[in-house]
């Protein structure tokens, strides 16, 4: 089977939406029966985003096989059925690390190690490896054409197109076509200069996706085609939309998938986008709305919680309600009190690291528990719920996590010191171990208790969810907490670790150690988020009586 590659680049400015455009195109090609995957190549020097600040980089998306990756991989999984893996995302730092390790081992037989050919060859090998077994691979190059960091990647894809044959490689370039209000027209010059920049590297784009706040007129698209040496039907207008799930239909209506299939000589049926039309219909026709407060520490950049925000929206789709998300800084709860949590239909505490704002989260969990407000805790959100219950219900004064207070009297959450890696080998880690790549990561099996609320929602006794954490519930102190009324609703496959807790005498209080947001999609939703939004609607109705 021959694999075809679509290389996606961006020009003029960053944040044009290359990831969304690539994912939308992949969704159309998948709807034509093709086996599609997407890769993201990040030009930064970090080995992976695992230790990067969420405020700088956005969330870290965790794949099934435990890779800490760029948030764009979350978009990919929400748009196509193919599951991403560690092969779908790599960085400049990862490439250089691999090449330097080979150099130290002597693999290059004393040769002078250079960007060309050693770095570019390593990039090409990764791309080929990631594309194995697929009909079409979309490869998104992070950054903007012209950035010095992107040059090795651009050179590598230029070479790769020659290596595999131009009949199996296609370059798609996203560019900005700004509207000038004073002139009353869109301007094509930035696009022309961006393509000129690509040409100077040796890449002639085959398709241009023109991003604008409005539809780019046909005469302007013809002008772009003429000056950029691109077929007129390959100049696609992609205007701003109120829902990203409309983009597959917009691209299909302009014949982008037909153009690509013809270019690659792929004989496949017409795309059926009925599932996406259903998503758009559900989004456009809600029967009500709810307000959910998300209490976190990285709220100045909503992308830090991208998958959680999307999963809440998916929960809204499944309940035919619009979810209004109110982002609340947990430090504000500490300084201003729980008054700022008034008028919420439900409360969610997402994952996080570090002590800043933790007491605000503990106070939030208590407020939700004592006032019967639906509560969903994720990762740290489960740990603070446990700490709060231990302190205020189980009589364990000053209970805490050893992450925050190492020598506390009741360490109800503690560091896991023994781990099994993907090969089954036992590793011992301590608080002095490296932060990068040393967490419990990826898909893990969980057994649900028969009487639990989550068992009803999932409809199955065992589930698989993705993890990203270093601290766990301390089993040594669990008996006292359970005796006070907390329900252990889910345990790890080996029965050793607590994965889900519930408060039984509460309408809906669920907290999980894993990250359910990573497996939620607009077409299928997720049982926990669908149940959570439903509980918010029911709470709203009770309050209105």
UniProtKB/Swiss-Prot annotation:
L-glutamine binds at residues 352, 380-383, 403, 470. GO terms for biological process: 'de novo' CTP biosynthetic process; pyrimidine nucleobase biosynthetic process. Keywords: ATP-binding, Glutamine amidotransferase, Ligase, Magnesium, Metal-binding, Nucleotide-binding, Pyrimidine biosynthesis. Residues 1-266 are annotated as: Amidoligase domain. Its EC number is 6.3.4.2. It catalyses: UTP + L-glutamine + ATP + H2O = CTP + L-glutamate + ADP + phosphate + 2 H(+); L-glutamine + H2O = L-glutamate + NH4(+); UTP + NH4(+) + ATP = CTP + ADP + phosphate + 2 H(+). SUPFAM superfamilies: Class I glutamine amidotransferase-like, P-loop containing nucleoside triphosphate hydrolases. Allosterically activated by GTP, when glutamine is the substrate; GTP has no effect on the reaction when ammonia is the substrate. The allosteric effector GTP functions by stabilizing the protein conformation that binds the tetrahedral intermediate(s) formed during glutamine hydrolysis. Inhibited by the product CTP, via allosteric rather than competitive inhibition. Pathway: Pyrimidine metabolism; CTP biosynthesis via de novo pathway; CTP from UDP: step 2/2. CTP binds at residues 14, 147-149, 187-192, 223. The keyword Ligase applies. InterPro entries: Class_I_gatase-like, CTP_synthase, CTP_synthase_N, GATASE, GATase1_CTP_Synthase, P-loop_NTPase. Coiled coil: none annotated. The keyword ATP-binding applies. Mg(2+) binds at residues 72, 140. One of its GO terms (molecular function) is CTP synthase activity. Catalyzes the ATP-dependent amination of UTP to CTP with either L-glutamine or ammonia as the source of nitrogen. Regulates intracellular CTP levels through interactions with the four ribonucleotide triphosphates. HAMAP family: PyrG (MF_01227). Belongs to the CTP synthase family. NCBIfam families: PRK05380.1, PyrG. This is CTP synthase. It comes from Citrobacter koseri (strain ATCC BAA-895 / CDC 4225-83 / SGSC4696). The lineage of its organism: Bacteria, Pseudomonadati, Pseudomonadota, Gammaproteobacteria, Enterobacterales. The gene is pyrG.
């Amino acid at each position: 089977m021959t694999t075809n590659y679509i290389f996606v680049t961006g020009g003029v400015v960053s944040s044009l939406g290359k990831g969304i455009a690539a994912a939308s195109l992949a969704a159309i090609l998948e709807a034509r029966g093709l086996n599609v995957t997407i890769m993201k190549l990040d030009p930064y020097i970090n080995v992976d985003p695992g230790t990067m600040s969420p405020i700088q980089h956005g969330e870290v998306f965790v794949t099934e096989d435990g890779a800490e990756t760029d948030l764009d991989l979350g978009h990919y999984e929400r748009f196509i059925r193919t599951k991403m893996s560690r092969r779908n995302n790599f960085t400049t730092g990862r490439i250089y690390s691999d090449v330097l390790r080979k150099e130290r081992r002597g693999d290059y037989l004393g040769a002078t190690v250079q960007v060309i050919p050693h770095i570019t060859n390593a990039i090409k090998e990764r791309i080929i490896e990631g594309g194995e077994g697929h009909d079409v691979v979309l490869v998104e190059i992070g950054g903007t054409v012209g950035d010095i960091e992107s040059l090795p990647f651009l050179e590598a894809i230029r070479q790769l197109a020659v290596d595999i044959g131009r009949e199996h490689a296609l370059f798609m370039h996203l560019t900005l076509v700004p509207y000038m209000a004073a002139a009353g027209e869109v301007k094509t010059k930035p696009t022309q200069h961006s393509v000129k920049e690509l040409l100077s590297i040796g890449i002639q784009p085959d398709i241009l996706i023109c991003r604008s706040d409005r539809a780019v007129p046909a005469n302007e698209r013809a002008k772009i085609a003429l000056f950029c040496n691109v077929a007129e039907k390959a100049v696609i207008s992609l205007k701003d939309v109120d829902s990203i799930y409309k983009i597959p239909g917009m691209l299909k209506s302009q014949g982008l998938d037909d153009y690509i299939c013809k270019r690659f000589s792929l004989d496949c049926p017409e795309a059926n986008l009925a599932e996406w039309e259903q998503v758009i219909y559900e989004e456009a026709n809600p029967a009500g709305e709810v307000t959910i407060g998300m209490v976190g520490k990285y709220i100045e950049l909503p992308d830090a919680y991208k998958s959680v925000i999307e999963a809440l929206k998916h929960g809204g789709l499944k309940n035919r309600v619009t979810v209004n998300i109110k982002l609340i800084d947990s430090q504000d709860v500490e300084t201003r009190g729980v008054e700022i949590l008034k008028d919420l239909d439900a409360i969610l505490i997402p994952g996080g690291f570090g002590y800043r704002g933790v007491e605000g989260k503990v106070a939030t969990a208590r407020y939700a528990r004592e006032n019967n407000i639906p509560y969903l805790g994720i990762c740290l959100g489960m740990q603070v719920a446990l700490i709060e219950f231990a302190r205020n219900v189980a009589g364990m004064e000053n209970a805490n996590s050893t992450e925050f207070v190492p020598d506390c009297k009741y360490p109800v959450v503690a560091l896991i010191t023994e781990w099994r890696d993907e090969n089954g080998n036992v590793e011992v880690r301590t608080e002095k171990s490296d932060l990068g790549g040393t967490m419990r990561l990826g898909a893990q099996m969980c057994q649900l208790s028969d009487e639990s609320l989550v068992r009803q929602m999932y409809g199955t006794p065992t589930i698989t969810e993705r993890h990203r954490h270093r601290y766990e519930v301390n089993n040594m102190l669990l008996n006292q907490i359970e005796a006070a009324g907390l329900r252990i609703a889910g345990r790890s496959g080996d029965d050793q670790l607590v994965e889900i807790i519930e408060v039984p005498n509460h309408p809906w209080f669920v907290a999980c150690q894993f990250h359910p947001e990573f497996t939620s999609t607009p077409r299928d939703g997720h049982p926990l988020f669908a149940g959570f939004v439903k509980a918010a609607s029911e709470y709203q109705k009770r309050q209105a009586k």
